């Protein structure tokens, strides 16, 4: 509907950019792609851009496995292996704090703990605060980020990048195709180092299958 309105208001050419693996409404994206010629009343040209300049080889190879039919190429830049860390709920703040310290020791300035939901981000920030640890919570009301350690939801992390990323508690809560897209978004935020944690019995089948 939005493209139809724009096309009728402004008689010009359009360039549309997007990543199907980062959409949170997969059906809407498919409908748009399949009907674009009808909406614009003319033939559209589809160009696939599949080279990333952001992440290291190890990170790209990992999220290629997570994404739906993803085959992203990368600039040849080696980095550290993707890390998987099991935690216990009663001690995970300490584990996360240790991971942050290791990231800082490697010279990573911008570090994000990425949660699945805004509520998870808020609860986790409160747990850090109760432990006497100062950490930035980026939510819908945040208008500035000081390039330090932060807690942020996947939705709010879209479009951002960080030296190091810790994806929080990738357990059985990640199971659907939309969850696969969410996980892909989280992992593609990382430039140099990516760690996934889990405080449940097993990591999500989306990453172990």
Locations of the language-model features?
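Conserved helicase motor core of SF1/SF2 NTP-dependent helicases
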Residues: 1-209
